């Protein structure tokens, strides 16, 4: 065991050789490096697998021995200051390491196929390897300075990966937005770290917690200043985990490749904020006001993310807002002091959401064969539908992930989300109502995504896709961006769908066309010819095995990973793995952890939460499932016509929800108006002051001197005697003025 912990410092550096060798190889031997690109993929997977085995071994030891190991090296700069760096291994570290490596390995396997056509294939794997190193370094850090160092590296990797297709203006803007937003959080985190060091004189976690708690108990420091430092520490996780109000970067981050969304924006990077709050929870927990702020930010994010996901057309943006909402659940649990349930949901959500993102990537990959390589088309759920018979394996995996996220037993997220909902009932009735209501909204928008994507018929061929929208048909695009025309409810839906559309287009002719190699200079990768004069329709196809295999593995995780947190610790049974791993753990709501679970209460609460989820699924079914199948006679719409006043109120509500969701809750607009425009006005005023006032004074002195010289030259007539006469005259006048003022004092 000692040898295992002794060499744990190497964990973050095991994946590092790949990005280093790729960088050197592309610089010195570009042709050979590119020809061996599959070898780099295998090496990345192999090295990350070593870290995974190492992390599993550490976790098994901690389950049975409940030990924490820390090793620190000191670098003494002078007698008063020394920098300490090392590694810290505890259950939280081992859990995060397993999460990073398992999802990372599967994403690397997936990316080998998904990115195979891309000219930046090797650059992608170099970024991925560097990101894995940064994330592993973050979770094994023993002090706040190391955390901040790797925190910044993670942010840099996120910037590079979001802007991977940097020739597309949208992707370039998205990575800049993510970078700037996270810099705001990082600045707050840095101020908090410096403030804590000024108070305690230490960066080490263990020393920091002990000194901080002593200060609080003995009232030896200003509580307001301590609270301010703790809040500044929390600002970093607010930005990194996309919590309100610094969540605005996450949906735009979907402009990166889909495997990045699965790894960084579902399982690891956005979980870094949750990790840091969990790591610093012994510090936050002694300040009740900070704990309440954490829970408040969490519950606001839970509701906001769910409402913003209600009317998204882009499948990845819908999943991004779902991620934001689920991260809010974790932050809520940490704010309530429910350490175990927060980390449990972190684990279950990571695998479920990674499955959903990889499933969406498989769908996008299939749709690109029909609509081209434009994300506006291939990711648009309005153009999908009826994919069940075309991509059955992807559909099954996506359905399991959707059911898990909705909280349907016995899938993974049911167990963790149910714990958070139960704890919210003990913490605050208002928070419990919001959390439970959002569980219903989660089921609604997730099955909205599922129905729009997989049920009905392929909508691509029901829409005039020649660049203009068919007004009558486009009104069927539920909550589309420009849905101006109301649906005429005086005729049935079947004639509307089967009407003759003379401009119906096919998107591939019988010939095969190559993709242009000059990809880097194009905004989108486009197919050279769509054969618009043909009437042959092509349909999506199932993805290759290297795309399906990671999805099936994640499906197994989604089915069974919840078992590690099921409370089996009844009389004669002791099988609660997660509780063993987090012993001793922090829980303000269940202080007596030895009590057995009341299964009657558990079943009652579970029935309530599942009923809410089922109700959300039913509403989604009523609104989205019938349009091509079960409600062909427009029964639902006809029922609304019978109660005209209710129908008007219903339409107003739907329009309000759509506008709220489409405009992102007006948070981006608020930031643009109040912050960005204000900064631009200030920059213009500063530019004016600098050029007109500061430069004006300098230039004015120079111009004045120039004109005085010219006047003097003109008066002197270019003769030395005239210059001497003027010089002596000026000196005489100056002496007379000085003499006059000198004698005036007397």
Swiss-Prot record:
Entry's Gene Ontology cellular component terms: chloroplast thylakoid membrane
Entry EC no(s): 7.1.1.-
A Pfam family this chain is assigned to: Proton_antipo_C
GO MF entry, a single one: NADH dehydrogenase (ubiquinone) activity
Segment forming the signal sequence: none
Main localization (coarse): plastid
Name the UniProt record assigns to this protein: NAD(P)H-quinone oxidoreductase subunit 5, chloroplastic
Organism for this UniProt entry: Crucihimalaya wallichii (Rock-cress)
Gene behind this protein: ndhF
